[in-house]
Amino acid sequence: MAKCEKGYLCAVCGKEVEDLIDSELYLRYTVGWLDPEKLHIAPERHLMCNPALAQFINDERFSELKVPSEADKQQLDAEFVAKRTELLTRGYRRLVELQQAGESVSITDYPLPEAAARYRLGG
């Protein structure tokens, strides 16, 4: 993360979210679930501290999570799970790319193309 992006504390465990690839906040922003205008006031969490969301990341660099009972993706509609997994996995892979690029990427370039297009249109 850029220096200005460091210091976010996890709303669940209270520890600093040190790396972009651990950030639920930036994953939500990258996939288009968080308005850029709310990025600085939205709560942050480690991805691992939100297993209900993190279970949809399907990447060898991310630890697989088991989620208790009704929140487990195995209990959800297969089409919903497939779409959510595709989106959040792409978002996570984008965070990996961004972290590898270092501070050379503008925050306005973080979102996936379809999210960036929605943000530009104001919706």
Describe the function of each predicted region.
Residues 1-3:
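Short, charged surface segments at domain edges that flank catalytic/cofactor-binding sites
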